[in-house]
Amino acid sequence: MQTKFKYLLNVVAKDSVSGFEGVLIARNAHLFGCAQYGLAPKELGSDGSPRKTEYFDESRIEILDATNAADCENDYDRIFAIPLGSEVKDKVSGFQGKALVIMENLHNCNQYYCEPAVDKCGKPQDGQWFDEGRLAFVSKGITPEEVAAPKRGAVFSRDLPRK
């Protein structure tokens, strides 16, 4: 079970598959074990507006320049106030659900993607993103260890050792 990020924020990186390059401005951890990184392009779009941040799995990230790396924690439990899988409630709207994804942004804004229980007909409902300060811990919920599954099947190129 992954419990820490591999890469620091504010480094120049690229996606090893597509070649997309940018500054690593966000990193997120998922209840089901993966970590992703948000790369913000350094150049503007053709219309002069900022280009969209793109997210890539940790295994696809290649660091190009770590000169300006942020001095930040990498352990999830030292970054986030509420553990993954916790049942939480939004203090503003009353929305309640489980924290499935936690995101750390470069400029000190941690956010949680929370998904509510199924509706009265048993249908899944859409989750919502909330800033950390808006959420109150309700209960333990489900731990990452309870949903961890061993890898099965073929080896994908992203799982092979890299130089």
Give names to the regions the model predicted.
Residues 25, 61-63, 79-82, 102, ...:
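Weak global preference for isoleucine
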Residues 2, 9, 14, 58, ...:
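Low-complexity, intrinsically disordered short peptide segments enriched in small/polar/basic residues
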Residues 1-11, 64-87, 159-163:
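Mixed-charge, Lys/Arg-rich low-complexity intrinsically disordered regions
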Residues 2-6, 12-60, 91-93, 98-134, ...:
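Basic/aromatic-rich interaction segments and small domains that mediate binding to polyanionic partners
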Residues 61-66, 126-128, 132-163:
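Beta-strand-rich cores of mature extracytoplasmic or soluble domains
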